A protein has these predicted regions:
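Short, acidic/polar
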Residues: 61-75, 129-145, 189-195
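Beta/alpha (TIM)-barrel catalytic core signal, keyed to glycine-rich beta->alpha loops juxtaposed to Asp/Glu
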Residues: 26, 30, 158-312
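N-terminal binding-site loop/beta-alpha segment at the start of enzyme catalytic domains
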Residues: 2-109, 238
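Alpha-helix N-cap and loop-to-helix initiation/capping positions
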Residues: 60-67, 93, 97, 125-136, ...
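Acidic (Asp/Glu)-rich catalytic clusters
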Residues: 40, 77, 99-110, 142-146, ...
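Conserved beta-strand positions
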Residues: 48, 85, 113, 152-155, ...
Length: 312
């Protein structure tokens, strides 16, 4: 079984237009988005995803190593204190970059990583939930990140070849051993979340969710009901909707912002448990992403965006 990631027709987080980069790039602090408590860890609701820091196909080193380091350091300067990564990004290289850029970590910085996807080449992702493999990857992430305990460890994918209870159960055992503080899940449905919660306390879920892909609505509603974090990956994939002459263009202009920034503002307004993690490999893309934390949509604007983009 292979997962090939987002479709090639969608816009990646690091592809804003020149016009987008010229709008609303003031150094807004990520704290403008408000905060959320994940377990007992309080973080700003605008995080950073490290997948785009690596090479093409999320494979190999970045094209510009020094710029990747600058991106991470600038993110923290701008108040981003929730950094999402995974053993499979690179593989391993994103975790290495995070340690190089940010270690020793500030007390308020939360590093969330994942395991459960095996990499054999660019754009190839193979679920592997063998409990012994998950344990091995947790141990290696501890070394790469330079920590004694991982703040949030997420099961990257549920492997159908192993019982869910065994996969989550191994993370629970590692938690009891003090190697993991909190456990999260990625790409699950409501039933899988509830099944996992019979084995361990789950504090977050991470699914594909954005203006144009809302198949995880039921999971988001469940996360909000339970008060656990919902981390949408690929949050800026809005395709043609992000074009200046698309449905978001006029409203974006009213805010002095870009359509992509409005897409982030919509997510932040959608639910108080949402923690977007837009990623990029360039500082000049990072800053407008963080600036979106300062955009406050009215309920009327939120509903207008919702109506214009639903089902697109």
């Amino acid at each position: 079984m292979r997962w090939t990631g987002p479709g090639s027709g969608a816009r990646l987080e690091e592809d804003p237009t020149d016009d987008e980069r010229s709008t609303m790039t003031d150094a807004t602090n990520a704290g403008a988005a408000g905060t959320i408590t994940i377990g007992e860890l309080t973080v700003n609701r605008l995080g950073f995803g490290s997948m785009r820091l690596t090479g093409k196909g999320v494979w190999g080193p970045p094209d510009d190593h020094d710029e990747s380091i600058r991106v991470l350091r600038r993110a923290v300067e701008l108040g981003v204190n929730f950094i999402d990564t995974a053993d499979s990004y690179g593989p391993y290289l994103a975790e290495d970059l995070i340690r190089e850029a940010l270690h020793p970590y500030r007390d308020d910085v939360v590093i969330a990583t994942k395991a459960g996807l095996l990499r054999t080449g660019p754009d190839v992702w193979i679920p592997l939930g063998n409990p012994s493999y998950l344990r091995q990857e947790v141990e290696m992430s501890l070394r790469r990140l330079g920590v004694d305990r991982i703040d949030l460890h997420q099961l990257h994918r549920i492997d159908p070849n192993f019982p869910l209870e065994d996969q989550v159960g191994e993370l629970a055992t590692l938690q009891q051993e003090g190697k993991i503080r909190h456990i999260g899940l990625s790409e699950v449905d409501v039933d899988q979340l509830k099944a996992a919660q019979k084995v361990a306390s789950i504090v977050s879920v991470q699914n594909l969710y954005n203006l144009t892909t809302r198949t995880a609505e039921a999971l988001l509603d469940e996360a909000e009901t339970q008060g656990i974090a919902f981390i949408p990956w690929f949050p800026l994939a809005a395709g043609p909707l992000a074009d200046a002459d698309g449905p978001l263009g006029s409203l974006a202009a009213d805010h002095g912002a870009s359509p992509s920034q409005l897409a982030l503002a919509w997510l932040l307004k959608r639910s108080p448990v949402i923690v977007p993690i837009p990623g990029t490999s360039r500082v000049d893309h990072l800053e407008p992403n963080v600036a979106a934390a300062g955009i406050e949509l009215t309920e009327e604007e939120f509903q207008a965006i919702d109506a214009a983009t639903a089902g697109k």
